[in-house]
UniProtKB/Swiss-Prot annotation:
Disulfide bonds join C2-C16, C3-C12, C8-C15. The modification Cysteine amide is found at C16. It is found in: Secreted. Keywords: Amidation, Disulfide bond, Pyrrolidone carboxylic acid, Secreted, Toxin. It comes from Conus araneosus (Cobweb cone). This is Conotoxin ar3g. The keyword Disulfide bond applies. Its main location: secreted. Expressed by the venom duct.
Length: 16
């Protein structure tokens, strides 16, 4: 998923 990383889970927009 997109929100698997700590820094991504805060802003789940496009997969970072």
């Amino acid at each position: 998923e997109c929100c698997t990383h700590a820094h991504c889970s805060q802003g789940c927009r496009p997969c970072c």
